[in-house]
Amino acid sequence: TRAHWIMDHLPGAPLAGEIYTFGNSGDSTFVGRKVDGMNEPGTLELHVPDGATEITFDNGALGDRFQQVGNTIYDTLPVVPGVDTRQIVLRYAIPYNGTSLDIRQDFPYPVDQLSLLIADIPGLKVDAPELESGGVQDLSGQSFQIWRKSGFTPQTIELKMAGLLGENSADPRAAAVAAGDDST
């Protein structure tokens, strides 16, 4: 399993995107298992942090292909054998008060490579003790703090962010674009 976790900022609610690539090392299609609270069997399990809202997917809808039980979301499509046979793109917002946010994100499967990209804004401080910092990198004109972890078993990743945009704050990146400065 590979996972990419991408976070951007809106005043009062960071937006998160997660991209997962799954495979099935068996020789038969996995059709799922019974999950309490669902009528259909669940095949793949994803977790969203406490308080996540506006949950969407690229290839399916919550309440249809994807079913939510608590903070766990299950895919209901069978998983065929092979490497990287399923990709899931999940998006959500995480509302918060003030300018800091603590997130606990569960990864229920072994992960070969996790990449966390957090859009960098002036004054943003990130503490991710389980991850290795890759510094700040420019990707398509946007600066991101890069964090990584390789080869880990199922676990919870804790992330603490301070210096986020408060609910009624102006986004400094928008001000820089308006001023003609594309360096942020």
Predicted regions: what is each one?
Residues T1-T184:
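Lumenal/extracellular ectodomains and adaptor appendage modules
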